[in-house]
Amino acid sequence: MKNRAFVVLLTGLPGSGKTTLAKKLVKKYGGSHINADEIRAAANDWDFSAEGRRRQFERMRASTEGKEGFVFLDFVCPVNEWRDEMGADLIVWMDTIQISRYEDTNKAFERAVNYDLRITSFDEDMLSLFDDKLIIEQ
């Protein structure tokens, strides 16, 4: 990789395993993990309206600027259009649950349409799915 991060967007409902997977991916492949909850807390913006969610999307997209190596974005990213706009090199849909504990997020979340990997069950073997996807170019 040269002068630019390889961005992996882990999208899915709250509780689908995004954070756990991001931590495992960083441990195996290196890079950085950017957690949407931590970004929201740093901004002290707890508005979950459509406008608040869009602001969070913009913060998450900006969080990759200036980074190198693998960057794992751990983010619900509820709207298909936003997932496309993120500019991620790899989109992983964590489709492990159908309903989260947050009714407002359930309503806002659009089932992923464009993705590179779809994870439907969470197990240790799933890490091998990334072996041919996360290759550092010299």
Predicted regions and their residues:
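Residues at the C-termini of beta-strands that transition into short coil/loop
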Residues: 37, 94-95, 120-123
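Conserved lysine of the Walker
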Residues: 18
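NTP-dependent small-molecule kinase module
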Residues: 1-4, 8, 24, 28, ...
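The conserved Walker
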Residues: 14
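Glycine-rich phosphate-binding loop used to anchor ATP phosphates in small-molecule kinases
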Residues: 49-102
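Conserved substrate/cofactor phosphate-moiety recognition/catalytic segment
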Residues: 22-65
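Residue-level preference for the first positions of well-ordered beta-strands
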Residues: 5-9, 32, 70-72
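Short, charged, surface-exposed secondary-structure boundary motifs
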Residues: 43-44, 99-109, 128-130
